[in-house]
Curated annotation (Swiss-Prot):
EC number: 1.14.11.-
Residues the entry annotates as binding 2-oxoglutarate: 170
Start and end residues of each Fe2OG dioxygenase domain: 80-179
This protein's record includes keyword Zinc: no
Gene Ontology BP term (one): intracellular iron ion homeostasis
GO MF term list: 2-oxoglutarate-dependent dioxygenase activity; iron ion binding; L-ascorbic acid binding
Keyword Oxidoreductase on entry: yes
Residues the entry annotates as binding Fe cation: 98, 100, 160
Protein name, as recorded: PKHD-type hydroxylase Bamb_4479
NCBIfam families per record: PRK05467.1-3 (NF003974), PRK05467.1-4 (NF003975)
Entry superkingdom: Bacteria
Length: 227
C-alpha cells in the first residue's frame, strides 16, 4: 500500500528545515554509514550524521508534525517511529535497487521492526532532474516525485531505488515505522475501512450503521495489533 500524504510540513517549516540543512557543513557524511550489507554497494549519496544535534532538532520538527497528521496515523498505525534521517543527492548520486533492513536499533538500544518506509520530500520537483523514488509493489513499478513538504508511505518490504540526480539537489527526510499491525495487507484493509467510515460520517449516513462499522474496525485492530 502506497499512500501520498500532502502538506506534512508547511512551506515555512520546509524553508526552515532546508536552510538549516543547507548550512549543515561537516554534519553531511557519506550515506553508506547507515546502509546494510546489500545496500552499501549501490548507495551513493550524502546524509546528515545520524546522532548529530541538527538531526535531532529537525527530526523533532517532523515527529511533531506526524503526531498531528491523521492520515499518517491511519495509514501507518504507528507503534514506534525511528528518528528521522536526512539525505542529499546531487551530481549523479543515486541509490540502486534494494530492500530496507528488517530491524533498526533506536538510540536507547531498543530494536525497531521496519514495517513501513517513509520519505518526506524537502526539495520541489523543479529543483532537480532525476531523483525519482521508484517502488516495486504488487501492482507494478511506481515512480514518486512529490512537492516539498509531502510524504510517501510504503511497505518496507518493497524493492525500491532512487534514480540518479542529473541536475540540482534532491533533499529529503527518511525513516521507518514499526506499526501496530505488521501485515501490509491487514493495514491496507484497516486504512480502507477507516477512510470509508470517515466519508460515511461526513455524508450524514445512518448513525447506527456507522457505529457498527467503527466497532468492526476496532475489533479487527484488536485482533491484529501488537504492542
Amino acid at each position: 500500500m502506497l499512500v501520498h500524504i500532502p502538506n506534512v510540513l508547511t512551506p515555512e517549516q520546509v524553508s526552515m528545515v532546508r536552510d538549516r540543512l543547507d548550512r549543515a557543513g561537516d554534519a553531511w557524511v557519506d550515506g553508506r554509514a547507515t546502509a546494510g550489507y546489500t545496500g552499501a554497494p549501490v548507495k551513493r549519496n550524502q546524509q546528515i550524521a545520524e546522532h548529530s544535534p541538527i538531526a535531532r532538532e529537525l527530526g523533532d520538527v517532523i515527529l511533531a508534525a506526524l503526531e498531528r497528521n491523521p492520515l499518517f496515523i491511519s495509514a501507518a498505525l504507528p507503534n514506534q517511529v525511528y528518528p528521522p534521517l536526512f539525505n542529499r543527492y546531487e551530481g549523479g548520486m543515486t541509490f540502486g535497487s534494494h530492500v530496507d533492513g528488517a530491524v533498526r536499533v533506536l538510540p536507547n538500544g531498543v530494536k525497531l521492526r521496519t514495517d513501513v518506509s517513509v520519505t518526506l520530500f524537502l526539495s520541489a520537483p523543479d529543483e532537480y532532474d532525476g531523483g525519482e523514488l521508484v517502488i516495486e509493489d504488487a501492482y507494478g513499478v511506481q515512480q514518486v516525485k512529490l512537492p516539498a513538504g509531502d510524504m510517501i508511505v510504503y511497505p518496507a518490504t518493497s524493492l525500491h531505488q532512487v534514480t540518479p540526480v542529473t541536475r540540482g539537489v534532491r533533499v529529503a527526510s527518511f525513516f521507518w515505522v514499526q506499526s501496530l499491525v505488521r501485515s501490509d495487507a491487514q493495514r491496507a484493509l484497516l486504512f480502507d475501512m477507516d477512510t470509508a467510515i470517515q466519508r460515511l460520517n461526513a455524508s450524514g449516513a445512518d448513525t447506527d450503521a456507522c457505529r457498527s462499522l467503527v466497532g468492526c474496525y476496532h475489533n479487527l485492530l484488536r485482533i491484529w495489533s501488537e504492542t
